Amino acid sequence: MTEQKLSDNERLKRESNFLRGTIADDLQDRITGGFTADNFQLIRFHGMYQQDDRDIRAERAKQKLEPLHNVMLRARMPGGIITPTQWLAIDKFAEESSLYGSIRLTTRQTFQFHGVLKPNIKLMHQTLNSIGIDSIATAGDVNRNVLCTTNPIESELHQEAYEWAKKISEHLLPKTRAYAEIWLDGEKVEGGDEEPILGSNYLPRKFKTTVVIPPQNDVDVHANDLNFIAIADNGKLVGFNVLVGGGLAMTHGDKTTYPRRADDFGFIPLVNTLEVAAAVVTTQRDWGNRSNRKNAKTKYTLDRVGVDVFKAEVEKRAGITFEASRPYEFTDRGDRIGWVEGIDGKHHLALFIENGRLLDTPGKPLKTGVAEIAKIHKGDFRMTANQNLIVAGVPAADKNKIEKIARDHGLIDDGVSEQRKNSMACVAFPTCPLAMAEAERFLPDFVTDVEGVLAKHGLAEDDNIILRVTGCANGCGRAMLAEIGLVGKAPGRYNVHLGGNRNGTRVPKMYRENITVPQIMDEIDQLVGRWANEREDGEDFGDFTVRTGIIEPVLVSKRDFYA
């Protein structure tokens, strides 16, 4: 690190007394519905973001009222597994104690509560704690929720991978007692807080980790700082290939920021997993940029110091030498919607949840439907990184019962197209303070329009496009790994990126900047027309746009993304 002035977030963390700040005092202040000064940032380390309802912000200002401050909470659920008992408890809390009455499944393979007012925040944490859930470190400059491929078919392998996701999450978790003290009325103990892995100033920026079972890339490895690719021998997990330095966030107009693929460091046996995880995190802790938060993520550290230098430091700290990577291949990222049978004879029902939003609407009481399933289900639920929900471990005798509940509540709809199943958006308006354009509320009608274009050009149901919309350049909707990625620029305007591929191993490049939705549809119409007429046999849309020179491929992000 060069000696530059540290960002103010570094002061904030240093002075926070291991993430306590004055959050407890702020909770008692009912003059404002929000958190003040440093606490606005510090609550992120406890899994919350302060938000407000942007649909009514101007009206409240007219009435001389502050914005309707509330928090969004993101739960820590390594691997996305939740029991029916836990589900019924979160369903009840969302219904009774949040402004929107919904549960939002997210691209981080967990659930979010939106619209929780200050008087209900402590109740929320205590409710979660009573069912064995917390939200420690799901936001802020820490290792966040650890993702794991939801592979219900290879049940034994999935169980092993899931156990590692949990172990990695626990190993990298903050050790401060602040969460228990503030939210769970834990006993205050003077001194003694230590953070051997994260350090007293925590990480320079957010850090994301996955465990993935090829050939499924449902967790999108290249969106994450640290990835453990499961390598199996005769169905048994023997170790991991380690990929480091992925990430999708960027800043509009700042060409020192860009999405980037992760680099393959090599193979490690299982016994070295936790040491390597800690070594990658501590190297980024010590070498990451603490002066400019826009360049603070692991991907920029790798590009600044060099992949080989970073890798050698990880080897030194972990006391290992990476072996050559073992062969693997990604073939798909989508969830297998519908029923599948695992090798253990259990059945699993993957439900497509558009945008991950579980809410009761006229004719589609989705949230109630999942709760009704939870009342009789003997297995567990698995949230996916594609914002869907798997009813897992269903005995053959219960299949018909569970399918009937799902159909009666609109959770199974045979009319949903493959295109819709392969489309995704982040939350954006009205709750996300960073959103520049609509995403979740925009996507359903946009997909309908794209379906019309595909039909117009005579394309079959299987001929669909990985389509993603994100409301700003931070990339929660993972548009920077889509075949067509829309990035919000202003209300009704988006940058359009082309050239990603179906298995999520290529970053798309900007094709059109700051254009309106009608202009976007014109562009898609022309592009799909060309694809239908000029493609090679079975050629996917993203590969077609690269092969025909419509867009140049991004091979090295730092060099190619803006070229």
Swiss-Prot record:
Pfam families: NIR_SIR (PF01077), NIR_SIR_ferr (PF03460). Coiled coil: none annotated. This is Sulfite reductase [NADPH] hemoprotein beta-component. Its cofactor is siroheme; [4Fe-4S] cluster. InterPro entries: CysI, NiRdtase/SiRdtase_haem-b_fer, Nit/Sulf_reduc_fer-like_dom_sf, NO2/SO3_Rdtase_4Fe4S_dom, NO2/SO3_Rdtase_4Fe4S_prot, NO2/SO3_Rdtase_4Fe4S_sf, NO2/SO3_Rdtase_FeS/sirohaem_BS. Binds 1 siroheme per subunit. Binds 1 [4Fe-4S] cluster per subunit. GO terms for cellular component: sulfite reductase complex (NADPH). [4Fe-4S] cluster binds at residues 426, 432, 472, 476. Siroheme binds at residue 476. The keyword Cell inner membrane does not apply. It is an enzyme of class 1 (oxidoreductase). Component of the sulfite reductase complex that catalyzes the 6-electron reduction of sulfite to sulfide. This is one of several activities required for the biosynthesis of L-cysteine from sulfate. Belongs to the nitrite and sulfite reductase 4Fe-4S domain family. It catalyses: hydrogen sulfide + 3 NADP(+) + 3 H2O = sulfite + 3 NADPH + 4 H(+). GO terms for biological process: cysteine biosynthetic process; hydrogen sulfide biosynthetic process; sulfate assimilation. The keyword Phosphoprotein does not apply. Alpha(8)-beta(8). The alpha component is a flavoprotein, the beta component is a hemoprotein. The gene is cysI.
